[in-house]
Amino acid sequence: MTKKELIDRVAKKAGAKKKDVKLILDTILETITEALAKGEKVQIVGFGSFEVRKAAARKGVNPQTRKPITIPERKVPKFKPGKALKEKVK
């Protein structure tokens, strides 16, 4: 499902204007992104949680030179589904 399709479905279910739903969705995504950038964990009960975790440094290969390289440790966003979401997906 694309963002546009999500907006269409939510607008139809809620009986709201697509423009309003888009603004709300954009604001939610921006707020989650800002919180993660600050290192905060975002929990939505019944849905799941978003957090930033560290990905350990690892060995890799430079695709242009084929020489071994070390890929440095980095921060990556992670999503952990909540119990209710897991149950619905089963």
Swiss-Prot record:
PROSITE patterns named in the record: HISTONE_LIKE (PS00045)
MF annotations from Gene Ontology: DNA binding; structural constituent of chromatin
UniProt KW keywords: DNA condensation, DNA-binding
GO biological process, alphabetically ordered: chromosome condensation
GO cellular component annotations of the record: cytosol
Pfam families associated with the record: Bac_DNA_binding
Region (Disordered) residue spans: 57-90
Family stated for the protein in its record: Belongs to the bacterial histone-like protein family.
Function: Histone-like DNA-binding protein which is capable of wrapping DNA to stabilize it, and thus to prevent its denaturation under extreme environmental conditions.
Protein name: DNA-binding protein HU
Organism: Thermotoga maritima (strain ATCC 43589 / DSM 3109 / JCM 10099 / NBRC 100826 / MSB8)
Name of the gene this protein is made from: hup
